From Swiss-Prot:
Molecular function terms, GO-annotated: ATP binding; ATP hydrolysis activity; kinase activity
Record: residues binding ATP: G31, P32, P33, G34, S35, G36, K37, S38, T39
EC number: 2.7.1.-
PANTHER family referenced in this protein's UniProt entry, alphabetically: URIDINE KINASE
Family indicated by similarity: Belongs to the YFH7 family.
Name of the protein this chain belongs to: ATP-dependent kinase YFH7
Role according to the record: ATP-dependent kinase that could be involved in endoplasmic reticulum membrane assembly.
Keywords linked to the UniProt accession: ATP-binding, Kinase, Nucleotide-binding, Transferase
Organism for this UniProt entry: Candida glabrata (strain ATCC 2001 / BCRC 20586 / JCM 3761 / NBRC 0622 / NRRL Y-65 / CBS 138) (Yeast)
Top-level lineage group: Eukaryota
Length: 345
């Protein structure tokens, strides 16, 4: 059993260490199917937000500051991303052209919209698109239940079933959905680049010296010129990703990524660790769990989702796909002394 409260304290302490130099902390929770990474990420988010809301009850909310400290132009967050600004006509053409669905070297494209925001698309097209935009008036409101932690699941970057239909071997693609090639890793990498850039924004905290807490630093330095980033999520009822299911706003000072391939040392996934490490504002947690335990959990999940008719069928499905993916990642995983290991058997 993972001690989420201990994780919360570690994350908040880590934010305090970087709060004078970095606007946000990026936390990565990595683990095989059935390891509990999604549950842990959500519980960690809730624990952090609950602690912050408790903090707000004890202070004068008038001390919350939201300013345009850095007068940020969102163009800087899409500059340096490989690709080019594209026309609507070219975007429409790409929707009908699935030649690139297996191309892990696909160059992501960006489109500037009339309101000045950008959409960034990879080989998965619009369903896996990212949007970078200015904060709305509603987002700038610091009244009510201001939350500072958000979760970004990797699941929103599953390639759609329509994309899988256009693989050279569509039967394999559908059978092995969840393997690394069946994700839009191109666009997920762009998301990591964007989030790393936002973490390097200099925070204008309202304290001198060191006599302040992490929550003091956060409350004194909300910068409403930091862009909002909209990210796809996976709709289980549709069995496909949908755009703009998660929003990271300027209030999101701790962003928790969760997924299987975040430390995978192949193709686009292999670049994530170095990109976020260069921001000096990251924490990686790798979840360990025995195969028997994750098999049991995933089989029950498959049965509950109606994907199989029995627990035994669920175990068979796990062994033919989920287990293969888990073993592949374990065999080809980035290792580093700063990756923290936690067990969830």
């Amino acid at each position: 059993m993972v001690d989420v409260n201990r994780l919360k304290e570690e994350v908040i302490a880590s934010y305090r260490e970087i709060c004078k130099e970095n606007y946000r902390l990026l936390v990565f929770i990595v683990g095989p199917p059935g390891s509990g990474k999604s549950t842990i990420a959500e519980k960690l988010k809730d624990a952090i937000n609950t602690s912050y809301l408790d903090y707000l009850k004890e202070i004068d909310r008038k001390t919350l500051r939201c300013e345009n400290y850095n007068h940020i132009n969102i163009d800087q967050f899409v500059q340096g991303i490989e690709g080019e600004t594209i026309s609507s006509a070219l975007e429409d053409e790409r929707h009908e052209n699935f030649d690139s669905v297996e191309n892990v070297d696909f160059i992501c494209k960006k489109k500037r919209l009339k309101d000045g925001s950008y959409t960034i698309t990879g080989r998965g097209g619009q369903l896996n698109a990212i949007k970078v935009r200015q904060p709305t008036s509603q987002e700038k409101n610091l009244e009510g239940n201001t939350t500072i932690a958000e979760v970004l699941p990797m699941d929103g970057f599953h390639l759609s079933r329509e994309c899988l239909d256009h693989f050279s071997d569509p039967q394999w693609a559908h059978l092995r959905r969840g393997s690394s090639l069946t994700f839009d890793s191109n666009n997920f990498l762009k998301l990591c680049e964007i989030m790393a850039k936002t973490s390097r924004i200099f925070p204008s905290i309202g304290y001198d010296g060191d006599d302040f807490t992490a929550f003091d630093a956060i409350s004194s330095s909300f910068d409403c010129s930091v862009p909002s980033v909209e990210v796809p999520g996976f709709d289980h009822s549709l069995k496909d990703p949908q755009p703009s299911q998660h929003t990271i706003s300027f209030k999101s000072r701790i962003v928790i990524f969760e997924g299987l391939y975040l430390l995978y040392n192949k193709e686009n996934w292999s670049k994530i660790y170095n990109i976020v490490s260069n921001s000096n504002a990251k924490l990686f947690y790798k979840i360990l769990a025995c195969e028997d335990q994750i098999e049991s959990r995933v089989a029950k999940r498959h049965l509950k989702a109606g994907l199989v008719a029995s627990i035994e069928d669920g175990k068979d499905k796990f062994r033919k796909n989920d287990l293969l993916n888990a073993r592949d990642v374990e065999k080809n995983s980035i290792s580093s002394e700063d990756i923290r290991l936690i067990r969830n058997d």
